[in-house]
């Protein structure tokens, strides 16, 4: 499925993947809530520059397309519809899932890291994350 004309500029300066395939639209139109909202496109940024490119694109389009928006998504486990929208979804889990800088008191994660993966690394050092995210699946 082709990108809608008004979203064609998304491909510019974007190294990641963009999909508008019907099966993907169906999958990303739901989360753990009772709601269903079909997005126009789903993006999979490869790095922070891709995320910046998406934000810049949407910001530049706001005048002509006031309804355009970005919704970041992890596991889609939100129970309030917070990970679905009718515009552009940014799936952080495919490429932005690195755990780094694991020291005695700190850890740095990218937004797509699953909690279970972080927990394994922390427990190997006899550490825990004292507060769980709302969804234990994602950090």
Language-model features, listed with the residues they occupy:
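N-terminal accessory segments
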Residues: 1-32, 57-70, 75
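N-terminal glycine-rich flavin-associated loop
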Residues: 10, 34-66, 92-134
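Short capping/connector residues at structural and topological boundaries
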Residues: 23, 30-33, 40, 82-84, ...
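Core alpha/beta catalytic barrel or barrel-like domain that forms the active/cofactor pocket
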Residues: 23, 73-74, 106, 131-139
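Flexible loop/turn segments at secondary-structure boundaries
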Residues: 27, 78-80, 115-117, 138-139
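Short, acidic (Asp/Glu-rich) active-site segment that either coordinates a divalent metal cofactor
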Residues: 78-80, 89-92
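Short acidic, glycine/serine/threonine-rich loops at helix termini
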Residues: 80-86, 119-121
